Amino acid sequence: MLNVNLGPFAVQVSHLLLLASLLVAAGVGHLVGRRQKTGISNVLVDMVLVALLAARMAFVAIWFDVYRSAPWSILDIRDGGFTPWAGLAAALLVAIWRGWRRAALREPLIWGLTAGALAWSVISGAADTLNPRLPTVQLKTLAGEPTDLAAMAKGKPMVVNLWATWCPPCRREMPVLAAAQQQETAVTFVFANQGEGAAVAQRYLSTGELSLANVLLDSGAELGRAIGSTALPTTLFYDANGSLVDTHLGELSTASLASKLKKLRTRADRLTKE
């Protein structure tokens, strides 16, 4: 499962797992600090805010050449462009600084952060074991011929984009994906339209001046159910063995797509050496 619906909003499961880990850290920190009437909730909030800022700044620095042509997009964090190690390092520095300034925080911080880290390791590890392999859902080409994702992959790493013509973020990210399909010839790109017919999809493609290969139809939106995502757009990144390497819910930017393709290439190199 990739996301959970909370009313009209689709929330990524990974974000919920992180929130659960933070709650564990806050709870344990509160219990340990009760004797000194000291909690660590405020410290955790500061750590999260600084971590987000540092992770975004590091990501932008790494992919600055991509952002250079559209600098305003640096502020659009909806593309999911964050560098986790930079955020983690910044968060730990905040914890060390706050503990150094106030001795009463040290024990609650140590126990709370340890508990939170253990909780994250356990629940994220359990979630990783549930990551689905390449779905076997039957799809159709625009010409009406049956096919599936394994047949489309042809032994290559694959990017699968779930989209619909009525979805504004889907339409905005299409030029980015179309350009990547032209450039990344070692990767198979598949565009699985969700819940619409061939005429609707073809009309959009013809009016949008997009040159896309491997556009498939999933009229029953079975692919979304198979991977556990009701959100559009959803993009899946599979290695050549059909194992899920990464996912992205929401609109991709050029930089965020480039970072995920780099991860896919790294996995491909590792599989080649094995």
Where are the regions that the model predicts?
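Short loop/turn microsegments at loop-to-beta-strand junctions
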Residues: 135, 158, 232-233
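Short, solvent-exposed mixed-charge patches
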Residues: 1, 271-274
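Thiol/disulfide oxidoreductase modules built on the thioredoxin-like
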Residues: 206-211, 218-269
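Hydrophobic, membrane-interfacing alpha helices
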Residues: 1-131
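N-terminal "domain-start" segment that seeds a small globular fold
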Residues: 119-151
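Short active-site neighborhood of thiol/selenol oxidoreductases, capturing the structured segment around
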Residues: 148-171, 177
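Hydrophobic beta-strand anchors of alpha/beta hydrolase catalytic cores
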Residues: 159-160, 189, 235
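Structural microenvironment flanking redox-active thiols in thiol-disulfide oxidoreductases
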Residues: 172-208, 219-225
